[in-house]
Amino acid sequence: MRITIAGKIGSGKSTVSSELSRITGYTVYSSGTFFRETARKMNMSIEDFNVYSESHPEADYYTDETQKAFMQANDNIIVEGRLAGWISYLNGINAFRIFLYATYYTRLVRFAGRENIDIDSARDLMEKREKSEKERYRKLYGIDVDDLSIYDIVVNTEFMKPPEIAVYIANRIDEMSRKDIFTPRILR
């Protein structure tokens, strides 16, 4: 089984993916880690690499094609990233698609803590990054990243701890699979 976990900045994608991996034993592939590593290799910050990617679509294509190839070649995996669900959907890859949701303020606080910066700086960075990503993905793939209709489950991460969220997701996948409710939606 393939599981994709998507969500906006600070929604808990990486943390929940790690917890779900602990429960399932599945390997986690993080497109965010790959994107950050590519930026680092180019001696750029994430923000600079986002700006670079706006005029160099090959940067996004490279990241997304790597993610797609990994999904196609592997099973029993968790693929975590902003576009993970969309990449599986657009490429007809059978996957259980999860979207993690949190309010803007919660995401902002989490992002500031993760980056070890003040709230105002976090707000500026988060808004620039999300605006850049939304516009790039619309131009590159014709998708609206705020369209949640492709997801099998949307989870609010506000009020549960990551281990609880992972258990909830694992239980929902198991329940839907056993009842044969889960029929992955594949774009044709």
From Swiss-Prot:
Its EC number is 2.7.4.25. InterPro entries: Cyt_kin_arch, Cytidylate_kinase_dom, P-loop_NTPase. GO terms for molecular function: ATP binding; CMP kinase activity; dCMP kinase activity. ATP binds at G7, K8, I9, G10, S11, G12, K13, S14, T15. CDD domains: CMPK. It is found in: Cytoplasm. GO terms for biological process: pyrimidine nucleotide metabolic process. Gene3D superfamilies: P-loop containing nucleotide triphosphate hydrolases (3.40.50.300). One of its GO terms (cellular component) is cytoplasm. Keywords: ATP-binding, Cytoplasm, Kinase, Nucleotide-binding, Transferase. It catalyses: CMP + ATP = CDP + ADP; dCMP + ATP = dCDP + ADP. It comes from the Archaea. NCBIfam families: cyt_kin_arch (TIGR02173). Belongs to the cytidylate kinase family. Type 2 subfamily. This is Cytidylate kinase. It comes from Thermoplasma acidophilum (strain ATCC 25905 / DSM 1728 / JCM 9062 / NBRC 15155 / AMRC-C165).
